Amino acid sequence: IKKCIDITKLRIITTLHSSIPEKHELVNKSKGSFHKSVAGLKNMYELGAKIEIKHCITKENIRQLEQFYLYCDNEFPENVNIQFCGIDYVGIEKKQLEKAFLSSEDIKEQLENTFDLYLNKRKHGSKRHLYAINIPLCACDVYYWKLMSLKKDIVYEGYADPYSNNLMEAERNVAVSEKYCRECKAYEICNGTYKTAFDYFGERLVKPYL
């Protein structure tokens, strides 16, 4: 790979569904993939690539959010970022939607507790960057908004075709809801979450700041 590209310009974002190998592999249906993924990320880091660990918060893993953060913090060098992300409900069978549903209130306690752990480590010298995307601001207290992506932030601009000079614009599938969020005091700065979440769960999804 090093002969073909400048690895230092690579930014690799890989999803780990859990810090528990069996739970990660239950999601991606690939036995042994957890340790292979971790080893692969470490190898790419040693080669000079920028590494980021993505963790989609689900009903299955929300209770282990602090554990996941601590695992990554102990396992990877400090300049490996950690990204928490809401989930897109597209592709989930309708009969399974209710089982998968998480409101902003459902994740608030665990998210804030994990942020507290992170901020305490920062206070004691840690250089790691942890942040959250595609999660409404009502999922945490205002104090933690510095760790949340805001409307002014551009997370993904589009897709660059490696075989041409074309840049394909990415369809914006994350937003706040005009119907359910308009009265919220954070409406103008909140990035919101996946539109599918609002489509399926409506006002149950959020708790606006009024």
PLM feature spans:
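Flexible, glycine- and charge-enriched loops at secondary-structure boundaries
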Residues: S30-F34, A100-I107
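Radical SAM/AdoMet-radical enzyme domain recognition
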Residues: I1-C85
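Flexible mid-to-C-terminal extensions adjoining Fe-S/redox cofactors in radical SAM and related proteins
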Residues: Y143-L210
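Short clusters of hydrophobic/aromatic residues that line enzyme substrate/ligand-binding pockets
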Residues: H24-N28, A100-L102, C190, V206
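Flexible glycine/acidic-rich beta-alpha junction loops that bind and position SAM and/or redox cofactors
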Residues: E60, V80-E105, R128-L150
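A broadly conserved sequence feature marking short terminus-proximal activation segments
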Residues: K108-M168
